[in-house]
Regions:
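A conserved, positively charged/aromatic
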Residues: 98-131, 135
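N-terminal strand-loop element at the rim of the active site
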Residues: 6-66, 148, 217
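Aromatic "clamp/platform" in nucleotide-sugar-dependent glycosyltransferases that forms part
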Residues: 234, 253
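A short helix/loop element that forms part of the nucleotide-sugar donor recognition site in Leloir-type
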Residues: 160-173, 313
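A short, well-ordered alpha-helix in the C-terminal region of glycosyltransferases
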Residues: 169, 299, 306, 313-328, ...
Length: 345
């Protein structure tokens, strides 16, 4: 039995915490036992995660008393691997590793610049969620030999082409209308603004842009939306109707991978994405969707017009999309690769 201590200093439950949940739940419980070290009040404590929760004070990187407490826990529970995800828990985990002799693995979920390569190079292994993230780490001085890419996996049983709800029925739209969809937090980096502008300028008949998500850009986007743009806010039932989109767009200025694109393609929805970060790995250009030049409105307009007006091309991409995700981005693939990595440390 290989005992693992996951550490996560974040209090929220976003993309990286969701990935950690999926990995923990998917691990072979006859081979791996997981303890999950979290701050008191962490939203992960409320989730269905197949582990033993442990509360630590992870709010400061150099809390000596807490580090010693974690060291004691590691020795008592014969922890062999410490897995970290964020800045503070990454430093804590590395220090505990050096004191106790446990191996330490750092997962990098973002493509934003890192503060110091040293805090990564002291790990035994670094997991990058895309090759784009791996390349960015190397460019900042992280040792290539330490890095392994393990793509984030999506629930291909939950996100299927067989949608339970047609978004047209819910919104009172014509049954033959074309639905362009986006599911993303309304923040500047997701670049909804360029999508709204491109969609408005195309002004195609019987075509609607459905926007799922909320965030700080809500008011700004409300000011430029037209009657053919429908903003639904946050929805808990996205997987039920995602498959009824005719195409999905993610125009982010920066993206480590783009999990929303994976979920859409798992539902056999063709995608359009900006050619930045890991999006070029999440979309197979001209096979499951189209890439456009990052932050280039004309390039986005061309991609939108092409897919909106060409039903045969949409059907071709749709037929390829589901298989592409099942083969490369399933939870099972992510978990098996993680298990193999743990066993070879």
């Amino acid at each position: 039995m290989l005992n693992i201590l996951e550490l996560e200093s974040s209090l929220g439950f976003g993309g990286q915490e969701h990935r950690t949940q999926r990995v923990i739940n998917g691990l072979d419980k006859s081979k791996f036992k997981v303890f999950y070290g979290l701050n008191p009040g962490s939203k992960s404590l409320e989730k269905q995660i197949e582990c033993e929760f442990v509360e630590f004070n992870l709010k400061k990187s150099f809390n000596i008393l807490e580090i010693l407490k974690i060291c004691k826990f590691v020795k008592k529970n014969k922890i062999k691997i410490i897995s970290t995800h964020s800045g503070k828990d990454g430093i804590i985990g590395a220090i505990v590793s050096k004191i106790t002799g446990a191996k330490v693995v750092r997962t990098r979920h973002l493509q934003t610049p890192i503060r110091s390569p040293f805090s990564y190079n002291i790990n035994d292994k670094i997991v990058a969620v895309s090759n784009a993230v791996k390349t960015q780490l190397i460019s900042q001085g992280v040792q290539e030999s330490l890095i392994e890419t393990i793509y984030t996996g999506v629930d291909t049983d939950k996100f299927t082409p067989h949608f339970k709800k047609d978004i047209r029925d819910q919104l009172g739209l014509p049954t033959n209308s074309i639905i362009v969809g986006i599911v993303a937090v309304l923040r500047a980096a997701k670049n909804h603004k360029i999508l709204f502008e491109a969609f408005n300028e195309l002004n195609l008949s019987n075509t609607f842009l459905v926007v799922v998500g909320d965030g700080p850009q809500y008011e700004n986007l409300q000011n430029i939306k037209t009657s053919n743009i429908l903003m639904l806010g946050n929805r808990a039932d996205v997987s039920d109707f995602l498959g009824s989109f005719d195409l999905f767009v993610l125009p982010s200025k920066m993206e480590a991978l783009g999990t929303a694109l994976l979920e859409a393609q798992s539902c056999a929805v063709p995608c359009i994405g900006s050619d930045v970060g890991g999006i070029g790995e999440a979309i197979k250009d001209n096979e499951t969707g189209l890439l456009f030049e990052n932050d280039n409105k004309d390039s986005l307009k061309n991609a939108l017009k092409t897919l909106i007006e060409d039903a045969n091309l949409r059907a071709k991409f749709s037929a390829n999309a589901r298989d592409f995700i099942v083969e490369n981005f399933s939870i099972q693939t992510m978990v098996r690769q993680t298990e193999k990595m743990y066993e070879t440390l």
